[in-house]
Amino acid sequence: MLEIGDIAPDFTAKDHNGRIVKLSDYRGKTLVLWFYPRASTGGWTAEGIGFQERIQDYKAKDVEILGASTDSIEANAKFASDQGFSYPLLCDTEREVCLAYGACKSSSDSPAKRITYVIDPDGKILQAHETVDARKHPETLLDSL
């Protein structure tokens, strides 16, 4: 897991719409990067919905949301569509982003761990959260910004 003050590793990956997303796209903005193990399951769905329900409050603070998992584009597209997510979901099927951020143990078939990073406008880790209550996390994180 990355530490507060670390430079966030740059990445390039496709989102659930097949668009290329890079960390550098978010330079100058604060970014919440939340990793979740599997699309359309349990607590991760509640957490994703929590971010969506507060998206305007995050935007009011000039904060962008980006979800990430090792799921396929198809699985994440269905997840985003079913839940009405307006923010992108990275499809890190090769686990490159997950490994760089300490959210995967290996490049084998392991899902991402639930980890959230807040990355500041200069690309440094501002906050790092590993153990959270999925239902409350989006609200408590928003309050901390």
What are the language-model segments listed below?
Residues 1-145:
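Chalcogenol-based redox active-site neighborhoods
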